[in-house]
Amino acid sequence: MKSKSIMVQGTASSVGKSILCTGLCRVFYKDGYNVNPFKSQNMSLNSAITCDGGEIGRAQYMQAEASNKVPSVKMNPILLKPNSDRGSQVIINGKVFKNMDAVDYYKFKPQLKKDVSKIYNKLSDESDIIVIEGAGSPAEINLNKEDFVNMGMAKIAKSPVILVGDIDKGGVFASIVGTMMLLKEDERKMVRGVIINKFRGSYEILKPGLKMLEDIIKVPVLGVIPYFNLNLEDEDSATDWSKFNFNSKGDIDVAVIKLPHMSNFTDINPLKMYDDVSIRLIEKVEDLKNPNLIIIPGSKNTIKDMEYLKSSGMNSAILNCHSNGSFVFGICGGFQILGSKIKDPNNIESNITSIEGLNLINSVTEIKTDKTTTLTEARDKIFNCNIKGYEIHMGKTLIDDNNSNFLVINSRNEETCNDIDGAISKDKRVFGTYIHGIFDNSEFTRKFLNLIRKNAGMDEIKETPKDYWEFKNEEYDKLADIIRNNVDMKKLYEIVNEGIDETDN
């Protein structure tokens, strides 16, 4: 039996589609439905790994968690990871296909559309309700041919559509009306409701505008969701970076270097659970100052980002901070940057075949053609804590001094192993690892933060915060409550149950 479905599309990127879909998944799950998320094509540098080693968008992973489901590549069959201004690494069904520029990818869309349809139908057979997320805007009229992301996907799924607009940026009425005007007549009929997102102010003042909007587009406004702050992971390329900074009064000043090709910046999210941590996102050398901890995050183009660090002077600033007592922590691409040299003999990332790193760790990385994507379990060699995370990298890093290895890996994708990962500098103030999600591990993170506190002459904090998964579950429940309290759920369920009649499209 095919599932019911509801599709969330937006007037633009970053209007809140991913978060709204996450909340709807949680609502339907809490109401007793077998719910699954789906996004046919995601473009993001933040990804996650499924239990079988497949790579999917971080948003669909989060939506699966909210649905109490094991994340699967069926939830996001196509993932595009930009690695240049005009091209992306194309991942199909969780595995790297190849790098493609926009023109070649556009030619490939007809085949992908067929594949997406088959995968969606398989997921539909396993579900009561599927929450489908669109991408960008359905009004990108130059991309309508062979579309399988927005209205094209709604037609494949025969799904009613909810259109979301972001009022916080201004112009929400124009963006909604303009989007509806640019849709084809059969597509407009599929839009069954509108949600206004990120509202601040008086609802009574807004209310007349909602009525006028309904009169113009002949579609009901199902709800107005207030602007809120929950600690949920963001993956959008149009991320509001101002939200990245956190708790300016924290004892431990953490500076995160904003690399041009930064990826998997969700690694930083768990640090927001710690009251003694302050987080700053650093773009300019003069803003770095002298933090307790510098984090160099993941990168989709490590060599280009190392080149940026040198040209901007950020490399010298990081080295000066380390000389003055700062800890430095590199994750994945950031780990590669910490080393002596990064080699790319096959020009996978750029036309630069070799570049010097920060030389904070005596290591050499070579970019390979094969990609490692694993769920990983390990123990660290300094605190002896269990670590769970995931690896996504195309580099292999060799450490000259084996005694400086950071972690011992005991399983990858549930297969037992005995491998080493990462490195710790001789002064024990530089740490590097390939394992994303390392700060999700509360026991390790608290001990690591206490090491920084001790180095700065501060007392240790004994209390370990709650498990990060427990923390995320609470955030999903709060999100579901926000949706229930601000969206006409009775009307929404009617839309889901009515579906789309074959004659509507």
UniProtKB/Swiss-Prot annotation:
UniProt pathway annotation: Cofactor biosynthesis; adenosylcobalamin biosynthesis
Domain GATase cobBQ-type: 251-444
Active site as annotated: C332 (nucleophile), H436
Keyword Acetylation: no
InterPro entries (alphabetical): Class_I_gatase-like, CobQ/CobB/MinD/ParA_Nub-bd_dom, CobQ_GATase1, CobQ_N, CobQ_synth, GATase_3, P-loop_NTPase
The entry's keywords: Cobalamin biosynthesis, Glutamine amidotransferase
Protein's GO biological process: cobalamin biosynthetic process
Molecular function, one GO term: catalytic activity
Short name of one Pfam family: GATase_3
Function: Catalyzes amidations at positions B, D, E, and G on adenosylcobyrinic A,C-diamide. NH(2) groups are provided by glutamine, and one molecule of ATP is hydrogenolyzed for each amidation.
Family: Belongs to the CobB/CobQ family. CobQ subfamily.
Protein name, UniProt field: Cobyric acid synthase
Origin species: Clostridium novyi (strain NT)
